Amino acid sequence: MTLPKRSYMKVTGLALACSSLLFSCVPKEVPQVNLIPKPAHIEVTGGYFKVDSNLIFGNDQSGTIRYVVDESFNGGNPEGYALNVTKKGIELRAASKSGLFYGEQTLRQLYTSKGIPCVSIQDNPRFPYRGLHLDVSRHFFPKEEVMKLLNVMSYYKLNTLHMHLTDAGGWRIQMDKYPKLTTDVAFRTESDWQKWWDGKDRKYLPEGTPGAYGGYFTKEDIREIVDYATARHINIIPEIEFPGHSDEVFVAYPELSCAGKPYTTGDFCIGNEKSFTFMEDVLSEVIELFPSEYIHIGGDEAGKGAWKTCPKCQGLMRRNGMKDVDELQSYMIHRAEEFLISKGRKLIGWDEILEGGLAPEATVMSWRGEEGGIKSARMGHDVVMTPGGYMYFDFYQADPKTQPYAIGGYTPIKRAYSYNPVPVDSLTAEESKHILGVQANTWTEYI
C-alpha cells in the first residue's frame, strides 16, 4: 500500500516518537566520557551523580564526597588514584595529595550540566615526566601568563614546565652578580622576531628605553611562579644556555666571548676561565630559586666556529689532548655537571650534549628525532623524548592557509596526541626504562 505523502510523514513521525519513548524507558543512560589523558582503566556504569547544594564532604562513610589518603594504596604510587562515582556519591582514593589532585582534575573534566557521569576509574601515569616547554626569551610572557599556562597544564595532568629563560632574544631572569643581563640585554628594538633577527638589526636597548620590547622575571616573580606551580603539583625546570645561544650575554659582558667584542658570536669562550666563573655564579643563583632536581644547561646548536681560531680555546684543547671542538663543548658540559652534582642537582640538556662525549650522569632531551634518545638509553642514561616532528608546538597544525604564522613543519593534533615516546623496535625492555617521558616544546620566534 502506498500512503499519501502527508500520511507517510505522520506515520514516520509517530514511529520516531514511539522510538523516543521506548529509549527513554531504559533505566540507565550511559553517557559518553572523554578524558585527556585517557585513564589506565575506566568503566562507565551509567547514570549521573547530581551536583547540588546538599553535598557533604568527609573522609568517612557519612560524606557524599569522600577523599581518602591511603599511603599503601596502589603500592604507594604518589600520582595514581581511584575514582568511583555512583548516583549516591563520590569516592576518590590515593596514596598522596598528588594523586588526589589528579583525581580532582578528572572530576573537573567529567562535570557536565547533567552532573558527573557514574564511572569507576583506576589511573596511573605511564611516565613520571610529562612536560611542556616555554620559550620566554624570543617572546616574553609575564608571570601572570605563565600562571595561566600552569592552570591549563594541571588540568591535563602535565607535571613539568621547562622554562627557556635565556637566548639571543633577551635574558629573562634577575641575576644579582651580573646586573647588566637585565639592565642592558633584557630589552630589544623590535617585538617581531623576524624583523629583529632576520632583518639583521639584533640590537638591545637599556631597561627603561621608551618603546623597547622585552622584560624579565625578578627573583620575587620566580618565587611566586614556583609556589604557584608547586600548589598544582608541577615542577619547573629552568634552562640557562651554555655554551651557545648566548648572544645577549656577550653584549653585556663581551670579555666572555672569544673575540672580546659585542655582537660577534653566540658562543662562550671555553678557553677563558672567566666563562666558568660566570656559569657557576649564574647557576648558583638559579639553584637558590628553583627546587627542581634538574637544571637544564641547553647545549644545543653551538656555532663552534670561533673556537677553531681562538688562541685560548686552542690552547685548552692542546693541554687536554682534545681532537676537535666537539670535545671542547663536552668539556664545558662535564664541568657544568660536576658543579651541579656538588650542589645536589642533576644536569639535563638537548641531545647535542652527546657530541664529544656525554657527561657521566646527564639526562638527554632528544629533539633531533629519536636517535639521540635511543643512543642515550642504550648507554644507560635517562631520556626525555621531544622530537621536533611530533612535539614542536610552533609548527603548523593544519593547512598553513588557515593557520597563524608558524616556523614551518606540520604537526596536527592527531600526530602529537598519538605519539609513543618509547621506540619499542629500537630498545630492549631494560633500556626502555630510561625513557622518563615526553615533552612538547613551544618555541616563540613566531609567537
Q: Residue ranges of each PLM-predicted region?
A:
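Acidic, contiguous N-terminal accessory segments
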Residues: 3, 10, 25-130, 341, ...
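Feature activates predominantly on carbohydrate-active enzymes
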Residues: 76-294, 335, 339, 434, ...
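Flexible loop/turn segments at secondary-structure boundaries
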Residues: 140-142, 168-174, 243-249, 296, ...
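Active-site neighborhood of glycoside hydrolase catalytic domains
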Residues: 249-250, 254-362, 367-378
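Flexible, acidic glycine-rich loops studded with aromatic residues
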Residues: 346-352, 360-362, 370-447
